[in-house]
């Protein structure tokens, strides 16, 4: 069995950057965001169920899911949101487990933005948290998504607090510094995980 390192962090913390640095070492990356898109591709159980529930006008002309329409449909509709989560979460989990079983690197990285919030660290052997100051999160997310600081603060309020996330971590990587520092930290953790991977 491959050792699974869970990777998480708040919005704008640099999870993707950190994951890509591990990927440079040939480590298999399993990304929950990518899987969440895959389980609603055309002709999947997920998309078929959404169409059955909400009708064909939830699709774009090319037959793919109209994500903004879906977002609007579930906005302030808690029952519908719960139904959607009940449909998609098991599909995402099943695909994550399937991808983990196919991993060939000494350990693999399971990247889940809301890992602590959804208690998905139970799927991992260790949890690595990318930690960053809130002011940095706001600046980065504003620059990346072109949104107002208030919008970013709302997202931060909906996520686990920095303290809760860090308390759940086995390893914490700070991403307030420069890219050279981050590369060095990833290199150290990679060596540590390679040594630990022999235990699994």
Swiss-Prot record:
Organism: Photobacterium profundum (strain SS9)
Gene: coaE
Pathway linked to the protein: Cofactor biosynthesis; coenzyme A biosynthesis; CoA from (R)-pantothenate: step 5/5
Boundaries of every DPCK domain copy: 4-200
One cellular-component annotation, GO: cytoplasm
Protein's recorded name: Dephospho-CoA kinase
Enzyme class: transferase
Keyword annotations from UniProtKB, A to Z: ATP-binding, Coenzyme A biosynthesis, Cytoplasm, Kinase, Nucleotide-binding, Transferase
GO process terms (BP): coenzyme A biosynthetic process
Family membership noted in the UniProt record: Belongs to the CoaE family.
Entries under Pfam families matching the protein: CoaE
Catalytic activity entry: 3'-dephospho-CoA + ATP = ADP + CoA + H(+)
GO MF terms, alphabetically ordered: ATP binding; dephospho-CoA kinase activity
Lineage: Bacteria, Pseudomonadati, Pseudomonadota, Gammaproteobacteria, Vibrionales
Subcellular location: Cytoplasm
EC number: 2.7.1.24
Domain of life from the UniProt record: Bacteria
Function: Catalyzes the phosphorylation of the 3'-hydroxyl group of dephosphocoenzyme A to form coenzyme A.
């Amino acid at each position: 069995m491959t050792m699974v390192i869970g990777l998480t962090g708040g919005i704008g913390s640099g999870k993707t950057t950190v994951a890509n640095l591990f990927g440079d070492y040939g480590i298999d990356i399993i990304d929950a965001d990518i899987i969440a898109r895959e389980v609603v591709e055309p002709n999947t159980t997920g998309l078929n169920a959404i169409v059955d529930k909400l009708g064909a006008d939830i699709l774009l002309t090319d037959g793919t899911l109209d994500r903004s329409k879906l977002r609007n449909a579930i906005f302030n509709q808690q029952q519908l949101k719960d139904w959607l989560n009940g449909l998609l979460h098991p599909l995402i989990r099943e695909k994550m487990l399937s991808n983990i079983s196919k991993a060939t690197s000494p350990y693999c990285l399971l990247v889940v933005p809301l890992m602590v919030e959804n208690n998905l660290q139970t799927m991992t052997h260790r949890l690595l948290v990318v930690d960053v100051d809130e002011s940095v999160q706001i600046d980065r997310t504003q620059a990346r998504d072109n949104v107002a600081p208030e919008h970013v603060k709302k997202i931060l309020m909906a996520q686990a607090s920095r303290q809760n996330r860090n308390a759940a971590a086995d390893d914490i990587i700070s991403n307030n510094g420069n890219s050279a520092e981050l590369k060095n930290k990833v290199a150290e953790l990679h060596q540590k995980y390679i040594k630990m991977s022999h235990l699994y």
